[in-house]
From Swiss-Prot:
Post-translational modification: Phosphorylated by ChvG.
SUPFAM superfamilies: C-terminal effector domain of the bipartite response regulators, CheY-like
The organism's place on the tree of life at top rank: Bacteria
InterPro entries, sorted: CheY-like_superfamily, OmpR/PhoB-type_DNA-bd, Sig_transdc_resp-reg_C-effctor, Sig_transdc_resp-reg_receiver, WalR-like, WH-like_DNA-bd_sf
Cofactor details (free text): Binds 1 Mg(2+) ion per subunit.
Cofactor(s) listed: Mg(2+)
Modified sites of kind 4-aspartylphosphate: 52
DNA-binding region, residues: 139-238
Binding site for Mg(2+): 8-9, 52
Pathway terms, separated by semicolons: Glycan metabolism; exopolysaccharide biosynthesis
Recorded name of the encoding gene: chvI
Main location: cytoplasm
Job of this protein: Member of a two-component regulatory system ChvG(ExoS)/ChvI involved in regulating the production of succinoglycan.
Official protein name in the record: Transcriptional regulatory protein ChvI
Length: 240
């Protein structure tokens, strides 16, 4: 049984979301503040976590920041309509998705299923136990110049330096690096990283690209392999 961690100080949300997820066969562990959640997430890692942003003792952003130091666990944020900046900041920090309150339980469940499904597809493709989703589904290993991506171990290195990526970041980068010099539209990158049932807008892909660039510049300040073609999309530079 897959476990979902739910972190929110609103007990009504904890109750309603837990009921919806448990009805789909998931085990739900709940927390009412970020500090206790961090301890529990590291001690008993779930398959996915859902965070509220505004919480006592440690807010969702700080919780994500600390979690990302040790884990690439998929994370969905619950946000309010007036928290657009927080949404963008969360994506830049490595959140996989966000849902704006008020939301339907069905929408949340579908987002959870989609993220867990793409993670399972990635593992199946790595182990050769299932069909690839499409032509851009990562293979076991990819080498492009100084870039090495190992799908089975979910590792990425640049110039022999490790770069920690979330599931979404890994899939986006792989889609770009798989065909250097070929422009990938935002729609194509959405298809590579998200289930077709999940709606994401352009700013989500843009935020993930910015996050990727930032992570690579942390190990190589001269990193410039991801190019932007304004109005068209992105591409990974061809190596000599």
């Amino acid at each position: 049984m897959q476990t979902i961690a739910l972190v929110d100080d609103d007990r009504n949300i904890l109750t309603s979301v837990s009921i919806a997820l448990e009805a789909e066969g998931y085990k739900v562990e709940t927390y009412t503040d970020g500090a206790s959640a961090l301890e529990g997430l590291l001690a008993r890692p779930p398959q996915l976590a859902i965070f509220d942003i505004k919480m006592p003792r440690m807010d969702g952003m700080e919780l994500l920041r600390r979690l990302r130091q040790k884990s690439d666990l998929p994370v969905i944020f619950l946000t309010s309509k007036d928290e657009e900046i927080d949404e963008l900041f969360g994506l830049k920090m490595g959140a996989d998705d966000f849902i704006t309150k008020p939301f339907s339980q069905r929408l949340l469940v579908e987002r959870v299923k989609a993220i867990l499904r793409r993670a399972a597809n990635r593992e199946a493709a790595a182990g050769g136990t299932g069909p690839a989703k499409n032509a851009d589904t990562p293979s076991r290993s990819l080498e492009r110049g100084q870039l090495v991506m190992d799908q089975e171990r979910h590792t990425c290195t640049w110039k022999n330096e490790s770069v920690t990526l979330t599931v979404t970041e890994f899939l986006i980068l792989h889609a770009l690096a798989q065909r250097p010099g070929v422009v990938k539209s935002r729609d194509a990158l959405m298809d590579a990283a998200y289930d077709e049932q999940v709606y994401v807008d352009d700013r989500t892909i843009d935020s993930h690209i910015k996050r990727l660039r930032k992570k690579f510049k942390m190990v190589d300040n001269d990193f410039d392999m991801i190019e932007t073609l304004y109005g068209v999309g992105y591409r990974f530079r061809e190596t000599a």
